[in-house]
């Protein structure tokens, strides 16, 4: 595992709902960082006060890594390649876009991305290598 760790939205939501990753997260080696894309996804889905407080606390607890201009441009190229290879509809590509940005941000910072969304991130990894751990 790399020195820097990013948790994907899936891991954070699973843990918030069921505490299923609490022990592993507490024992996680490396410096945990937040992704601005993950935080945006969490804010988008926060519908009650407890969820908003969770995101606010998370946002304030660690440094935030944000996709660069290069990451944004590269994400379009990756999604175009996925569309050409897999024939995905625009809605599926929109769903994948944030995941591609999260993966590219992790790659740019030499971070390990931890997710429970195996299918999407393993697909993305076929187009750009990055350190991935599945929980």
What are these regions (language model features)?
Residues 49-53, 82-83, 131-134:
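Short, hinge-like loop/turn segments at secondary-structure boundaries
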Residues 2-4, 103, 107-135:
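Acidic, PIN/NYN-like endoribonuclease modules and their adjacent C-terminal/linker elements
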Residues 1-62:
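Short, well-structured N-terminal submotif of metal-dependent ribonuclease cores
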Residues 7-8, 34-35, 94-96, 117-118, ...:
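Histidine- and aromatic-rich ligand-binding microenvironments
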Residues 64-116:
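Active-site neighborhoods of divalent-metal-dependent phosphate/nucleic-acid chemistry enzymes
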Residues 11-12, 38, 71, 102, ...:
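Alpha-helix capping/helix-boundary segments
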Residues 18-19, 45, 78, 124-127:
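Residue-level signal for well-ordered alpha-helical positions
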Residues 41-42, 74, 123:
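Phosphate- and divalent-cation-binding pockets in alpha/beta enzyme and binding domains
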């Amino acid at each position: 595992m790399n020195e820097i760790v990013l948790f994907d939205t899936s891991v954070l939501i699973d843990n918030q709902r069921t505490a299923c990753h609490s022990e592993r997260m507490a024992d996680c080696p490396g410096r945990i960082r937040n992704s601005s894309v993950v935080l945006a996804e969490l804010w988008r889905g926060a519908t009650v006060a407890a969820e908003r407080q969770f995101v606010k606390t998370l946002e304030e607890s660690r440094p935030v890594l944000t996709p660069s201009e290069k990451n944004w441009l590269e994400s379009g190229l990756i999604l175009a390649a996925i569309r050409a290879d897999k024939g995905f509809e625009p809605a599926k590509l929109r769903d994948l876009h944030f995941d591609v940005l999260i993966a590219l941000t992790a790659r740019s910072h030499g971070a390990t991305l931890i997710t429970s969304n195996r299918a999407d991130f393993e697909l993305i990894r076929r187009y750009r290598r990055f350190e991935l751990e599945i929980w």
